[in-house]
Design a protein with these regions (language model features):
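Catalytic Walker B motif of ABC-type/P-loop ATPase nucleotide-binding domains
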Residues: 162-165
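Conserved ABC ATPase signature
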Residues: 96, 137-144
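Conserved ABC transporter NBD signature motif
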Residues: 64-75, 79-80
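ABC transporter nucleotide-binding domain
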Residues: 181-270
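Conserved ABC ATPase "signature" region
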Residues: 104, 108, 115-133
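Conserved catalytic motifs of ABC-family nucleotide-binding domains
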Residues: 158
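Helix-to-loop junction immediately C-terminal to a conserved catalytic motif
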Residues: 56
Length: 315
């Protein structure tokens, strides 16, 4: 039976947290619906981990309110722990125990019966391609397999809300794909997922996103609507000297922003028709350019644009 609830699975109002005079989370407000994958996106220091720890009830807020799975995270912390699962960046696997023994440990911790544990574990291990590794020591697993085992342990008691702190950092592409396939299957069961990530390409897999910077909420919407807010168009220039391209064009007429992405430069321009003009500007500056083409905007382009606007307005 689906676990969806008639009200928002997560409600956050004016949530704030300070450490030694530094504001880590500054007045956050957002809501997450039942059976939704909601992403907290931003660079290191954006407040993602602090927010998740407050939502999990392990870190008390200094101000504001948060309700998760129908529980006040401060006043009803004990009830909350039975309704959610929190998977921090370093999940507590026991490396001298096998995959099966780790799952059994967490099932016992949450009071999950044997029959329910075996049925749930069987489905989750099959979904993650780990059925044949039941008797392997956790310490002998790859990084991606450890994360998938951590997710299985976190889900063994069938939580209503799953909180994940950058679970795919350092994980190989195949394991990342498996991980997300499991998350989508959880949504089909009615589970709500709140996940933090610094991978902006991965963020596009979420149903909705909260873009964070320095503990503040910049924007919150679906990936498609967020990208639709980007002014102008995106042009990608490739060059053996990408930094010189960025520096030469950052303040050129019609250029709203310039971002280094590997060996390319993403230019946010008011009109892609400026490409010949920009190519002439590079030639005049003696900067080589192999190609310059209009492309579809990415979340990375949007984030850089939004941060630039915030800095320009003093935010």
């Amino acid at each position: 039976m689906p676990l969806t609830e008639p009200v928002d699975a997560v409600q956050v109002e004016a949530l704030s947290k300070r450490f030694a005079g530094v504001t880590a989370v500054d007045g956050l407000e957002f809501r997450v619906g039942p059976a939704e994958i909601f992403g907290l996106v931003g660079p290191d220091g954006a407040g993602k981990t602090t927010t998740l720890r407050m939502l999990a009830g392990v870190l008390p807020p200094d101000a504001g309110l948060a309700r998760v799975a129908g529980c006040d995270v401060v006043r009803e912390a004990e009830m909350l722990r039975n309704r959610i699962s929190y998977m921090p960046q370093r999940f507590g696997l026991y490396e001298d125990l096998t995959v099966e023994e780790n799952i059994r440990f967490y099932a016992d911790l949450f009071g999950t019966g044997r029959a329910a544990r075996e049925e749930r574990a069987g489905r989750l291990l099959a979904a993650s391609g780990m059925s044949e590794f039941r008797r392997r020591l956790a310490g002998q697993l790859s990084g991606g397999m450890k994360q998938k085992l951590g997710l299985t342990c976190a889900l063994i008691h069938t939580p209503r809300v799953l909180l994940l702190d950058e679970p795919t950092t350092g994980v190989d592409p195949v394991s990342r794909r498996d991980f997300w396939r499991i998350l989508y299957s959880l949504v089909d069961e009615g589970v709500t997922v709140v996940i933090s990530t610094s991978y902006l390409d991965e963020a596009e897999r979420c149903h909705r996103l909260a873009l964070l910077r320095s503990g503040r909420l910049l924007l919150c919407d679906t990936p498609a609507r967020l990208k639709g807010r980007l002014r102008g168009e995106v042009v990608v220039a490739t060059s053996p000297r990408p930094r010189n391209v960025r520096d030469a064009l950052a303040r050129a007429p019609g250029v709203l922003g310039a971002l280094l992405v590997g060996t390319a430069v993403h230019l946010n321009v008011d009109d892609a028709a400026r490409i010949p003009e920009l190519q002439r500007a590079l030639a005049a500056a003696g900067v080589p350019c192999d190609s310059m083409l209009r492309v579809e905007a990415t979340m990375e382009d949007l984030f850089v644009s939004v941060v630039g606007e915030a800095e320009g307005s003093g935010g």
